[in-house]
């Protein structure tokens, strides 16, 4: 693990524990890795018929139910209006991108060539996400996809440290206000830098909050806020 990621993970643990400090006995969190699966539309595919769509969705939900039953799925649900053809996000409690990819290869929509999985290792606190009360009883939350914009400015030394400190301070403020459930970085050095999961569904409020982040102001990060319908009780 590189030093910068290590500092970020430590800070995330501190901010989540700090947000829980109002409790008599605040929980202690440790960081672990999950696999974030983004199911994306395959370009050029035609819309399936209603009967076929029902069959594929039944297979999709049956697989998710089995994964939840084994403790291999922690969170899942469709996204509304995400960029890049992303239709659904799934958080898997498995140890590697390869394992997650193997599981998703068995997904009904993927087998039919309608969706393709994009898998990222995600660092986050253990024990925040809870088993669903019922897979088909949903509730809305907001997924924040944190990306590095094309042509983002490069900084080093004290300037970069100041931006990172301000970034973490803003995350802590969002957690302390109760808007943010969990946050964490991606394990790889790509365009997708991390994700936020918000219980607050007021996107205008959340847009104002993330806009206060010095790294966003400096053009180093951008955050796409996407409505996400997840099983009730998970967040």
Model-based region annotation:
Residues 1-9:
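Bacterial N-terminal signal peptides that target proteins for export
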Residues 8-18:
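Bacterial N-terminal signal peptides
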Residues 19-23:
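Sec/Tat signal peptide C-region and signal peptidase I cleavage site
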Residues 24-235:
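Conserved, structured core segments of small domains
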């Amino acid at each position: 693990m590189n030093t910068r990621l290590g500092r970020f993970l430590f800070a995330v643990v501190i901010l989540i524990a700090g947000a829980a400090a109002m409790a008599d006995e605040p929980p202690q969190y440790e960081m672990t890795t999950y696999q974030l699966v983004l199911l994306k539309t395959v370009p050029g595919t035609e819309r399936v018929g209603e009967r076929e769509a029902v069959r594929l969705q039944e297979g999709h939900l049956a697989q998710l139910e089995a994964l939840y039953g084994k403790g291999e799925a922690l969170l899942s649900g469709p996204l509304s209006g995400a960029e890049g053809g992303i239709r659904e996000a799934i958080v898997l409690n498995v140890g590697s991108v390869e394992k997650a990819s193997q599981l998703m290869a068995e997904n009904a929509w993927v087998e039919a060539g309608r969706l393709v999985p994009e898998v990222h290792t995600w660092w986050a606190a253990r024990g925040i996400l809870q088993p669903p009360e019922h897979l088909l009883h949903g509730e809305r939350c907001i997924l924040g996809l944190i990306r590095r914009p094309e042509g983002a400015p490069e900084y080093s030394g004290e300037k970069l440290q100041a931006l990172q400190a301000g970034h973490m301070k803003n995350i802590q403020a969002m957690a302390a206000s109760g808007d943010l459930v969990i946050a964490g970085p991606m394990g790889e050095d790509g365009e997708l830098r991390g994700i936020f999961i918000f219980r607050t569904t007021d996107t205008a409020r959340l847009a104002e909050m993330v806009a206060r982040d010095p790294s966003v102001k400096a053009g180093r990060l951008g955050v796409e806020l996407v409505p996400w319908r997840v099983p009730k009780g998970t967040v």
